[in-house]
């Protein structure tokens, strides 16, 4: 069995056709077909079923796919390890993240990383939690940030942050004007969330929202499925529902006054932010540095650090004296 046969097999799966795989590999369609014929001969089983709409995996193909992806990922790791011997601060690295995590805390760390490693090309991909795991598992991403621990033993998971989630509404929503609220005020309200996916592939973010509503006695509440965080926030701002969002993802809207938090403790929640990588993956020095930065999520928040510095300065200045640098 040759490596180019496995490359062709995985390319067809990801591109959905022999033609697409040929374009990705710079091969003619007959050349791709020849490689698959040889692979199927080696396996003594067909890996694809040809249909009018393209191709789909056979049972043998589905069984072979994770091993093929692992083999290719290991090969790419080996190439990266050898290249790093001569050029340790060069190369490319992909970080896959859940879109709701693209907060000022994360972007500050990514800017610092780029400043420290200007010759490393850092690529970002956004996806749902289960998709982040899949990108890391098959080697398309070096590191991933997702919600909740993935039980897959092939992935190393490290909880780096516990994100607070708060209920919010539009500034002009009737609930925003009420000082005292209890759960009964939400009986007829709709909520926006990412589309639910049941079973093992369910999105932890959506499951957390549904679980919190159910625990508060609102299990029958209407959920408006919207697959974009930005669209969710715009819908809530327009009054088309309420949201249960990570605080970091609505920080700007809360400061601008277009969204208001709802002071109902029963509807507050937390969700773990988890950093993942493949258990046997090669991690360059740059990747390890990024892991360290992401693992210190709560340690060096610029806004918290500024507040701490000002507090210490006031303490040193003593009563009746201004801290340096303050007008």
Question: What is each stretch, according to the model?
Answer:
Residues 40-59:
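A short LG(V/I)-centered, amphipathic sequence patch enriched
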Residues 153-159, 163, 178, 230-279, ...:
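Beta-alpha-beta core module
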Residues 155-195, 202, 285:
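Flexible hinge/capping segments at coil-to-helix
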Residues 128-133, 137-141, 146-147, 204-262, ...:
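Hydrophobic hinge/microswitch elements
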Residues 11-31:
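Short helix-boundary/capping micro-motifs
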Residues 39-40, 113:
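Conserved amphipathic alpha-helical core elements
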Residues 189-216, 283-287, 291-292, 297-309:
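Secondary-structure junction motif
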Residues 90-153, 226:
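Central regulatory/effector-binding core of bacterial HTH transcription factors
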């Amino acid at each position: 069995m040759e490596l180019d046969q496995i490359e062709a097999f995985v390319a067809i799966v990801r591109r959905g056709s022999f033609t697409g795989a040929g374009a990705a590999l710079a091969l003619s369609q007959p050349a791709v077909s020849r490689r698959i014929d040889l692979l199927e001969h080696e396996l003594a089983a067909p890996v694809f079923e040809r249909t009018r709409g393209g191709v789909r995996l056979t049972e043998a193909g589905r069984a072979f796919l994770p091993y093929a992806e692992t083999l290719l990922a290991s090969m790419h790791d080996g190439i990266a390890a050898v290249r790093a011997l001569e050029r340790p601060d060069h190369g490319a690295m992909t970080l896959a993240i859940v879109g709701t995590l693209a907060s000022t805390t994360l972007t500050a760390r990514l800017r610092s990383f780029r400043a420290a490693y200007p010759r490393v090309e850092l690529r970002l991909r956004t996806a749902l939690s289960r998709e982040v795991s899949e990108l890391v598992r098959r080697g398309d991403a070096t590191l991933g940030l997702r919600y909740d621990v993935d039980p897959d033993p092939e992935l190393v998971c490290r909880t780096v942050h516990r994100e607070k989630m708060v209920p919010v509404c539009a500034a002009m929503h009737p609930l925003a004007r009420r000082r005292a609220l209890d759960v009964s005020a939400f009986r007829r309200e709709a909520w926006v969330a990412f589309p639910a996916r049941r079973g093992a592939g369910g999105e932890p973010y959506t499951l957390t929202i549904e679980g919190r509503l159910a625990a508060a006695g609102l299990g029958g509440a209407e959920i408006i499925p919207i697959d974009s965080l930005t669209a969710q926030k715009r819908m809530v701002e327009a009054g088309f529902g309420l949201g249960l969002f990570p605080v970091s993802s609505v920080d700007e809207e809360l400061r601008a006054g277009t969204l208001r938090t709802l002071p109902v403790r029963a509807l507050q929640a937390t969700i773990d932010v988890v950093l993942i990588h493949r258990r046997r993956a090669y991690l360059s020095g740059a990747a390890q540095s990024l892991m360290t930065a992401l693992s210190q999520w709560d340690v060096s928040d610029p806004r918290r650090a500024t507040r701490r510095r000002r507090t210490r300065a006031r303490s040193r200045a003593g009563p009746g004296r201004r801290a340096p640098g303050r007008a």
